[in-house]
A protein has these predicted regions:
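Terminal presequence/propeptide segments associated with secretion/organelle targeting
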Residues: 2-5, 10-725
């Protein structure tokens, strides 16, 4: 039977006429199709230039893997958010050199510090639609694990051919639930160094209390530099390396940013869920996300308790703590907005209309009916697995996770590279090595034991038919044990392992399967014991995943065709690929507190919020040098008369999500005016349902960053390099 589909460009053409003006995270190749909307919004440059990834400005935008950055000098200097560089700041911090607290500035190139092991910059250079290669006639006829394996095999083949061009990293990304696929090629820069980060009192001002909150006063910026080998090609860290020379970099705005101005953001948004089915929405907000939030809240409290009074422990757990707090508050915001909304009712009504349309013609029913029905039962299977296994990531000791990864490396290395598990091929070994290398700088045994014992006790209290006997046996536990007895058993496991030693872990990367099986290390033994069951679960997930991919892609195709029949827009959910969103600088009336939210905050708000180191957990503790400069009204050229101060953060109608952090916010001339770093708490529900009245993104105003760098931190070298006079 012939498959009917619309290309991404065709979908964009529909969207140009029907989407909300500021809604959508657009692929660069789609932008010429929405040129009229971009021009109407205020873009001065030719929209066609935005589709060329090797031209200005897209050639200046890079992925950090979970965050975005952009080149701002010809010497590979890149700016991103402070919270995106937090892991590298933490990795280089010690109690006697507390970069987290005091900040960091490299006065010379030689002073720039290696970022955390495994840090990368990826510059997207090409995108290719490979849907027909992935979903060829043979693969379309398959289901279950066979389908999953066939898709993975084709992906590996495409990636291997793409990566024959040395120095590049290639990946295949799925769109519309596996209906369409893109092969994305990126230059991989492997030597990344920390150049500058402001003090926590600037870069994290407001802390968790102000996270997802407006008005905001956070200097969320830091600088990296990309380095390459003497031959100009990507290379591992070496003192002989030299700064990378990007073909394009962004320039600071030559004109002031004002309310109502056009802005656009280029970045790598991680994930949205706007095309999810009603049953998925119901499960997410009815059980999964509330449970995740509860568990994360408990983990946050445990980490605080176990590291209290131990600065070394606080530093080691800082990156994990930041991530937990950020996601925890995000989930809370989503839940609060969902509970007071009609999102589920609207999703059900939309799905009922889709099913009625499918059943309204014999041809459509034959084409889509089976997939629509199958998706419902398959999603129910996945939900049952999630309920049983949600605690797994929280209850597993870090050293056991490490041991399982090490043993899997040994198992996969014995196979031909093309047959190895995705993520464990030769191309992945540097990433795996870096993960093992960084563990001890982010591992605190006291805290790790407490987390494991606490959540293992919860797991063992689940109904017996939901427990995995292999997991229970690997720990030497029994159902019904209390936390104290679990802790006693864990003490034996930790004492019987040497994996907390970096040299020991790194040595295991080069050992074979026989060495693992002969080991008496407690966590290595547990990893070996769990291996067969881990593969059983992997095959279970592949079987379900293959069935679900087939059905879900069919549902997405039905959804696309249904909306196309009505002349309505459909764009792909975010999936960590390069996208552009556009909008304008705009406040909100009313805000969540009932007041009018003005589009800009200023330095006055920092002074008003400042509480010092001993109140509010030290989250509102601006540096003394900064407060003195504000009091003296030493504003220089960054003073804005209409604000009678220097702008700090601003609101816009940009459509963004996690992964956009660090993304450059550009004006109509593609000049840098800010860095995207957050959204408002009631608008995080936009990941599931877009509401133009609510959605506001929060960005750092570049004028605040430049004021802090010039007036307080005196980073003259960097300002000169960026061409700031």
């Amino acid at each position: 039977m012939k498959r009917h589909s619309l290309s991404l460009l065709a979908l964009a053409a529909l969207a140009a006429a029907t989407a909300h003006a500021d809604e959508g995270m657009w692929m660069p190749k789609q932008l010429p199709q929405i040129a009229k909307s971009l021009k109407a919004g205020g873009l001065a440059m030719d929209p066609a230039k935005l589709k060329d990834l090797t031209d200005f400005p897209m050639g200046a935008v890079v992925s950090l893997g979970g965050c975005t950055a952009s080149f701002v000098s010809p010497q590979g200097l890149a700016v991103t958010n402070h919270h995106c560089a937090y892991g590298s700041i933490q990795y280089n911090s010690k109690p006697d050199r507390d970069l987290l607290k005091n900040g960091f500035y490299a006065a010379t190139l030689a002073d720039e510090l290696p970022a955390a092991p495994g840090s990368r910059m990826w510059v997207t250079v090409d995108l290719k639609d490979v849907s027909t290669e992935i979903l060829n006639d043979k693969t379309r006829a398959l289901t279950g694990k066979a389908r999953t394996d066939a898709i993975e095999a084709t992906e590996k083949s495409l990636v291997a051919a793409c990566e024959a061009d040395k120095g590049h990293r290639c990946n295949v990304y799925a769109f519309f639930g596996g209906l369409q696929y893109q092969l994305i090629k990126q230059l991989e820069i492997r030597d990344v160094r920390l150049v500058h980060a402001p003090a926590t009192g600037v870069g994290l001002f407001g802390g968790d209390a102000d996270n997802w909150v407006w008005p905001r006063h956070t200097g969320d910026y830091s600088f990296y530099r990309a380095y390459v080998g003497p031959d100009g090609k990507p290379a591992e860290f070496s003192k002989d390396n030299k700064p990378y020379l990007p073909k394009h970099h962004l320039k600071m705005a030559s004109s002031p940013l004002n309310a109502g101005d056009f802005v656009m953001v280029a970045g790598y948004p991680g994930r949205t869920d706007r095309h999810r089915l009603p049953t998925e929405v119901d499960f997410a907000f009815g059980w999964q996300q509330p449970t995740q939030a509860r568990v994360m809240g408990e983990a946050i409290d445990l980490i605080k308790a176990e590291t209290a009074g131990r600065r070394d422990g606080e530093i080691k757990m800082a990156a994990r703590m930041q991530g937990l707090q950020n996601y925890y508050k995000n989930l809370q915001g989503q839940q609060q907005s969902y509970d007071g909304s009609d999102i589920l009712a609207r999703k059900k009504a939309e799905f009922d209309k889709l099913r009625a349309w499918v059943n309204g013609s014999p041809e459509r029913k034959a084409r889509y009916g089976a997939d629509v029905a199958a998706a419902q039962s398959l999603l129910a299977e996945r939900e049952a697995i999630t309920r049983a296994e949600l605690l797994a990531n929280f209850m597993t000791p870090a050293l056991l996770t490490s041991a399982r990864q090490l043993y899997l490396v040994a198992q996969e290395r014995a196979k031909p590279d093309a047959e190895r598990k995705s993520g464990y091929q030769e191309r992945d070994l540097p990433r795996l090595r870096a993960a093992q290398q960084t563990l001890d700088r982010r591992y605190d045994e006291q805290t790790d034991k407490r987390l494991a014992s606490h959540f293992l006790a919860q797991y063992l209290a689940q109904p017996a038919n939901t427990l995995n006997p292999a997991w229970v046996d690997a720990y030497g536990l029994k159902t019904g044990q209390d936390e104290a007895s679990i802790r006693a058993q864990l003490d034996k496991l930790y004492a019987g392992s040497k994996l907390s030693d970096t040299a020991v872990r790194m040595a295991w990367l080069d050992k074979d399967v026989a060495a693992f099986k002969a080991s008496d290390d407690a966590f290595i033994k547990a990893a070996v014991a769990l291996y067969d069951d881990d593969r059983r679960l992997e095959n279970r997930d592949k079987e379900l995943g293959g069935k679900l991919q087939k059905a879900y892609a069919g549902v997405q195709q039905a959804m696309i065709d249904y909306h196309a029949s009505r002349g309505e827009a459909v764009y792909a959910d975010a999936n960590s690929t390069l996208r552009i969103s556009y909008g304008k600088v705009e406040g909100r009336n009313p805000g969540t507190d009932g007041s009018t939210w003005t589009p800009f905050t200023t330095l006055r708000g920092i002074v008003a919020k400042h509480k010092g180191p001993d109140e509010a957990g030290g989250e509102f503790n601006a540096p003394a040098e900064q407060l003195a400069a504000i009091k003296a009204r030493n504003f220089g050229k960054y003073y804005v008369k209409g604000l009678d101060s220097v702008p700090v953060n601003f609101l816009s109608t940009l459509d963004t999500t996690g992964g956009n952090s660090g993304s450059p916010v550009l004006n109509k001339n593609a000049e840098l005016v800010g860095l995207l770093f957050d959204g408002t708490l009631d608008a995080v529900i936009s990941d599931w349902s877009f509401d133009p009245k609510m959605v506001r993104s929060i960005s750092l105003d570049a004028r605040y960053m430049l004021w802090q760098m010039s007036t307080v931190d005196k980073t003259t070298r960097l300002l000169d390099e960026m061409g700031v006079k």
